[in-house]
A protein has these predicted regions:
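N-terminal glycine-rich phosphate-binding loop and ensuing alpha1 helix
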Residues: 1-36
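Short phosphate-binding loop-to-helix
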Residues: 33, 39-88, 96-104
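Conserved core of the sugar-phosphate nucleotidyltransferase
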Residues: 68, 95-185
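Histidine-centered beta-alpha loop that forms part of the nucleotide-sugar donor binding/catalytic region
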Residues: 57, 91, 121-122
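Short, high-confidence coil segments that cap the C-terminus of an alpha-helix
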Residues: 29, 82-84, 113-115
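Hydrophobic helical membrane-anchoring modules
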Residues: 182-184, 188-208
Length: 208
């Protein structure tokens, strides 16, 4: 994990500013909010004239549920009298996404009237294939027997973007149990920054 990764600079731009800059370019987005408990991120948001939602500490840990933070944001905004048809989440850890990806996501959601639309990329391996589990005694066992999977219909979920409605998010215990659609994004634009290696890779890809 990377400490304070959202404000780490990649090619002299804070990671979260890549998302701020993109969101401001998309005309279909009426209002932009950032949910955070960080004063530094709030200051960056203010410089971009972006609204902020103060996220509770209990929803700001590395193990916190993203969905719970969505619910908190929606409830907060509704109490403030905000009304909106769609809820679009653009996690700051995907700086390589572009306008085309997000416009496709919005169009897919509005066209097919699903409960949720997500972004995916083609998987590069079959789950559990060549994966092992290390037992307490230090010995290795195959994680699970190979199942009848095919790469053709298997995809990895990305953090490029998610879109739903406030109503669906608030009522759902598991958002994937509804009608879920997806759009395919290229793997090079689906990088999710989680560690130092990801930061180095993003730096190289963003220079292209």
């Amino acid at each position: 994990r990377v400490k304070n990764k959202n404000i780490r600079k990649i090619n002299n731009i804070e990671l979260i500013n890549y998302t701020f800059n993109l969101a401001k370019k998309i005309k279909l987005i009426d209002k932009i909010f950032v949910s955070t408990d960080s004063k530094k991120i709030i200051d960056l948001a203010k410089k971009k004239k972006i609204n902020y939602i103060l996220r509770p500490k209990k929803l700001s840990t590395s193990s916190s549920s993203e969905i719970l933070s969505w619910k908190h944001s929606i409830k907060f905004l509704e109490k403030k009298g905000e009304k909106f048809d769609y809820f679009l989440s653009l996690p700051s850890t995907s700086p390589l996404r572009n306008q085309v990806d997000i416009m496709k996501l919005i169009k897919n959601f509005s066209t097919f009237k699903s409960d949720l639309a997500i972004t995916v990329t083609k998987t590069n391996r079959i789950p559990y294939f060549n994966m092992v589990k290390i037992n307490k005694d230090g010995f290795v066992k195959i994680a699970e027997k190979k199942k009848n999977y095919s790469k053709k219909n298997l995809f990895d979920i990305t953090t490029v973007g998610y879109i739903s409605t406030p109503e669906y998010i608030l009522k759902s215990k598991n958002i994937f149990k509804g009608k879920v659609r997806s759009i395919l994004v290229p793997r090079e634009r689906a990088l999710d920054i989680d560690d130092e290696y990801d930061l180095k890779l993003a730096k190289l890809l963003l220079k292209k």
